[in-house]
Amino acid sequence: MEAHTPSAALVPVIDGVVGFRLVHNFGAAWGSFSGMVVVLVIVSIVFCAIILAYMIYVAKEASVLETVGLALIFAGGLGNMIDRLSRGYVVDFVEPLFIDFPNFNIADAGITCGIICVLIAFLIKFFAASKHVEHSE
């Protein structure tokens, strides 16, 4: 079984930049863990539960950026998990044409944007805390 099974012709959206092509992804990112649907669903459930618990019980003082990032990661993980449970694979359809990069979907984009938001929020907190320590000395 291939990790990525293209099942449609390319539909250009922005010529030379991005197009749509239906791909059945039986794995995770870049087709890793292909055919391990049960493992991927379990990992998705665990990560979604951890993020949800963190948002409810720990992140009460979280910034808007951190909250948005965690929500995007949670929603993306949930979306991909629903695909895996209902179809046995994730539906990927966005195909970058300007670089050699695997097809992805909106859930993947949400996860990526969410990780970036959380990292930026962490860096803002880190540098704000280090400035606070610097000024208090």
Residue ranges and their predicted role:
Residues 1-137:
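Alpha-helical transmembrane bundles and membrane-interface segments of multipass inner-membrane proteins
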